[in-house]
Each structure stands twice: as structure tokens, then as C-alpha cells.
Amino acid sequence: MNNEKSNAKLRFIISGGGTGGHIFPAISIADALRRRYPECEILFVGAEGRMEMERVPRSGYEIVGLPIKGLDRKHLLSNYKVAIAVIRSMRLANKTIRNFRPDMVIGVGGYASGPTLRRAHSLGIPTLIQEQNSYAGVTNKLLSRGAHKICVAYPEMDKFFSPEKIVFTGNPVRPEIEFGHPSRSESLRFFGFEQSESPVVLVVGGSLGALTINKSITDKLGKWAESGVHLIWQTGKNYIETARKAVENHPGLKCYVNDFITRMDYAYCAADLVVSRAGACSISELCLLGKPTILVPSPNVAEDHQTKNALALSTRAAAVLIPDTEAIELLTDTALSLVRNLAELSSLSEQIRTLAKPQAADRIVDEIARIVEHEKRAN
């Protein structure tokens, strides 16, 4: 690093994506970098056609899309197209890095981070990896050898990474969740509920819709109506019409149903119990807020990592785990019983809060700052 570069404002590339579980932490890290270094420049590198290409610009950051694709494990013969996409992505990553000249590259997982961090390693640019899950993804495991530090959210990650590189920072969460503190009455009004003694259950089916969770609710809406429990239900866009028709058939049901909840801070505040998939970011938010939770891990994820995330909580009595295969039969009855068991709710809340790591984005930026300062002194 010459004097001209060392005196310039810092530049960072953040690479990865594919799902909200990668994108929301990435944006939180970018926001924390801007708080620490107001003059810094930040460029995202993601995958063409994936969620990050919309979400990142919406958050005020520039993004470059690579033509990268993931492996098709069901149709292996079609993977020659993946190989071509990887070669094209490596070339574009090389061009992007040489033009932007970053001081550091941060990888947040997902196959889009592969070409970017590999090229950064070959050019001698320092890198840091953020692993959200309790079971490390393939891309992060491959990239970890060249990384300076690996920020993790779960203990015992030394079975995947070199212990000397691991820093236990926790997962960054959305600032409105970490720092927003709405009142319960305000939150209930947002969903059309009056202040009452009735318990509230929040069911989150994901952005597209978790079919098993949604069907578990739909099939037993009569029980929800009879219970007097208030229901906040995010169905995802693929299930909303089915859910609305089902709700209309139960006029006594106190239910707010929508495909997407814009104010999750209100939803969490209003809820006495949360039903959710076991994505890393959702779990981090629930830990931070100390929310009693039933986790229904998605079976449609790499390495079954959501089950491993959920087990990290359930084995510590910090959440209830219901396998996807048992949810239709068990979920409604378990939720309606648990939400009225105040002692069990209190115990779950206490245990899940012990796993929280607040201000995770700032902890990650602390590590980035140490690496940047070390590189400056070395050059």
C-alpha cells in the first residue's frame, strides 16, 4: 500500500447473498462501516437475478452482479453451465476488484462470494468472513483458508475453521429490531388488535411462504378461533390467497394475515410466542429480543443447516423444536398450549436471551478495523 493509497478514504467490498440470511447481515455491516468511517466507499458484489440485486440498492448501496450459479445437485449433467458461469464470474470479479481497489473484502456467504474473495486472496487483499449458521456453508469453508478472520455466531465452530481465526461476534440484525423499542399498545394497534389480556402468536412463513407452517395453521384455524388467541400471520406471497380465504371462513378468529409484514419490530413486540423457520438471522433477532419461540426448520436448505441451528437452541432449552415432518400434526396444538403456559414462556425467554450477542455489526467492524490498521502499519 503506497502513501497515496494509505491517505485515501477506505474502500470496502462486501460480497455474497442469495437469501435474506446473507443480505440483511451484509447491509448491517455496511451501515456499521459507514458509522465508523463516514467517508468510506462501499461496493457490494452479488449474484445476478438474486434478492440482493434489489435489496442492496434499496438500502443506498451500489452493487455489481456476477453471472454465478449454484451447483444443481439433482441434475449433475447440467453443471457444465455452472462451470462456464464461474469462469465468467472470476473474470468480472477480477475486473471489479482492480477498478475499485478495495482495502478489504468481506464475505457473508453464498456462492456469489466465492469468485470475489478468491480473487482478493490472489491479489493479497485482506479478507474477513462472516458465517451466520451453526453449520458452516461450503463456500465459507473453502474461503476460510485465505481469510484473516472469521466472525461466527455459534460456539464450537472450530470443527469448521482454524481456531486462531475465529471471533465470536454474533450475527448482525436489522437496526430497527435491535434499537427500535415500540410500545405493546402501539404494536397491537398496528395489527388491528385492541389492548387486551388475550395472548398473541406470531407465525412467520418466510418471504415466499413455508408451506408446512402455513398448512399447519390453515388446517386447524377452527382451533385458533375457539382459543381466543390473537394471530399475526405472515404467509409469504405464494400462500396469501389460500390463507385469506381460510380466514374469511372463520369470522370469530382474531387474525392479521398478510404476505409480508413491513414492521417486524411491531410484530415481535406484540407477540407472546413466535413460530418461525430456523434461519440464522431470524434466530439472532429472537435471541436479542428474548422471544419464546417454536422453531420449524426448513428441510430445503444446504446441509440441513436450519435443523442444526434449531438444535443449538433446543438442546439448551432455549426454544421448542418441531420437525417439518411433524408440524402439520403438532404445531397448532403445541402453540396454543404453550402460549398460555406463563412459566414455560418465561423460562424460554430467559434461556434464549442468554444466547444473544448485541451490537454484532459493530463487533465485526472492530475486527475489520484491526485488520485495516495492521495492513497500514505493515505497508
Swiss-Prot record:
GO cellular component: plasma membrane
Entry's localization field: Cell inner membrane
Binding-site positions, UDP-N-acetyl-alpha-D-glucosamine: 19-21, 133, 174, 207, 261, 306
Alphabetical GO biological process terms: carbohydrate metabolic process; cell division; cell wall organization; lipid glycosylation; peptidoglycan biosynthetic process; regulation of cell shape
Pathway named in the protein's UniProt entry: Cell wall biogenesis; peptidoglycan biosynthesis
Topology relative to the membrane: Peripheral membrane protein
EC number(s) recorded for this UniProt protein: 2.4.1.227
Keyword Cell cycle among UniProt keywords: yes
Database matches in InterPro entries: GlcNAc_MurG, Glyco_trans_28_C, GlycoTrans_28_N
MF terms in GO: UDP-N-acetyl-D-glucosamine:N-acetylmuramoyl-L-alanyl-D-glutamyl-meso-2,6-diaminopimelyl-D-alanyl-D-alanine-diphosphoundecaprenol 4-beta-N-acetylglucosaminlytransferase activity; undecaprenyldiphospho-muramoylpentapeptide beta-N-acetylglucosaminyltransferase activity
Keywords from the UniProt entry: Cell cycle, Cell division, Cell inner membrane, Cell membrane, Cell shape, Cell wall biogenesis/degradation, Glycosyltransferase, Membrane, Peptidoglycan synthesis, Transferase
SUPFAM superfamilies given in the database record: UDP-Glycosyltransferase/glycogen phosphorylase
Function: Cell wall formation. Catalyzes the transfer of a GlcNAc subunit on undecaprenyl-pyrophosphoryl-MurNAc-pentapeptide (lipid intermediate I) to form undecaprenyl-pyrophosphoryl-MurNAc-(pentapeptide)GlcNAc (lipid intermediate II).
NCBIfam families assigned: murG
HAMAP family xrefs: MurG
Protein name stated in the entry: UDP-N-acetylglucosamine--N-acetylmuramyl-(pentapeptide) pyrophosphoryl-undecaprenol N-acetylglucosamine transferase
Source organism per UniProt: Porphyromonas gingivalis (strain ATCC 33277 / DSM 20709 / CIP 103683 / JCM 12257 / NCTC 11834 / 2561)
Taxonomic classification: Bacteria, Pseudomonadati, Bacteroidota, Bacteroidia, Bacteroidales
